[in-house]
């Protein structure tokens, strides 16, 4: 279609009366406003071939679409492969070693392609009519050491480049050596081969790949490498655009055309949810039949002792609390290697929510020290305030009220900025998705109008330039002793809430209330329920603060706190259970 060549045609459109024409591949004029195609063709005068002769109504004839319009023949799995490659590169830029991309994620993806019968098998499911047979070689799926031999390159080259290949080579070469597609495969319903079939495919026992599943693959790879990134960190980096996720398809090579059913496959219009990605991680790990992951030991970043220290620093709590969190970890057995290590082939495959668990332990310690009943914490704050006024040269006691006031102000400011950033986020991609090539001009025109309106609106609302993407950081709050505007509580003492008894320290508070008195049945979809009105304001604030840090629902953190308490006060729960059983027996 050539708009410049159609400028000479000045007649009005019979449908919409507009004078805006373009040329089809057959040489006929069409209206760019309503897409009405006329019977008129372009008049071409060519005096070079036939002297003194005017040629009218020259039909250029049907011609094969050029490569720039049609693009490559590509499969859906190649699209997800490209997204995984983008995410792996982003993690590499964040400081993760290249082994995650070249070794771990590479092998996980190859294993998925084989187990889902899309590649690395004799007859890939999208290239022939019959179902392929996965190459077993009479070996166990869990034999990870023999996996490179098990995966023979039948229909798909390696996902990641070798040392000799550059990153640019991946985007310039055609990833899959695919034979000429049939008419049904190159349907206008999808830009990818088999896009319609993929969107309708429902096969029992097969984990269907989606864009959120790519984050599950990334987290599995990080967990295998025991990298210093938790699931909440990963999702926050996605939210801050450090890791491609929303509109990741716009970074596909130009030759990979997306339209039709590809919209539903690669288009994402919501932020990734912690619980959803967590479940998908277990689902993918189980489907791939992966062996037991490397042990999570005490020197590993994901161990609760290290994560507790990290989050204590994050929320400006005293360093002395770390001894108490370590004690809770030891008493509950949550620091044991077998408890922390992910084993997908175990009977009940599950992995620990490392970040949520660490935060829940801190909440339990705060309840042990201050009770958080909207009464005792303020009484202890009065004692700490009086002591600090009398002993200004000594190490200050931790004042819960002062900490609450400072943290609430910082939390409200941070949350407001976060909500504003979410409200201003541009969901529409720079590369619009459309259903067919007929809709392409309309889609790009709409996109152009949206961009212009956004520029005008931003000029009217805020004349200041929009801040650029902030650099990635493991911490969202920064507290230093040099900050004169905000008090740093890291070096404050817990003497006001602890008392000595022999060689040990005990809490002055001898009371404790359980977050959950009775857990839900095993067939229920949740462990416990959370209603804010049933709990103290102090407890609500603590949960809201940590939930914001991890970008999780408050109910999820409350559930984890209840599970920590169940392990810590196991005897108390068992006594309660026996009493309830005895009451039932008396009734009968």
From Swiss-Prot:
It is found in: Nucleus, Nucleolus. GO terms for cellular component: RNA polymerase I core factor complex; RNA polymerase transcription factor SL1 complex. Residues 40-68 are annotated as: B-reader. InterPro entries: Rrn7_cyclin_C (IPR048538), Rrn7_cyclin_N (IPR048540), TAF1B/Rrn7 (IPR033599), TF_Rrn7_Zf (IPR021752). Its main location: nucleus. The modification N6-acetyllysine is found at residue 440. Residues 74-261 are annotated as: N-terminal cyclin fold. The modification N-acetylmethionine is found at residue 1. Although it shares weak sequence similarity with GTF2B/TFIIB, displays a similar subdomain organization as GTF2B/TFIIB, with a N-terminal zinc finger, a connecting region (composed of B-reader and B-linker regions), followed by 2 cyclin folds. The RRN7-type zinc finger plays an essential postrecruitment role in Pol I transcription at a step preceding synthesis of the first 40 nucleotides. Belongs to the RRN7/TAF1B family. This is TATA box-binding protein-associated factor RNA polymerase I subunit B. It comes from Macaca fascicularis (Crab-eating macaque).
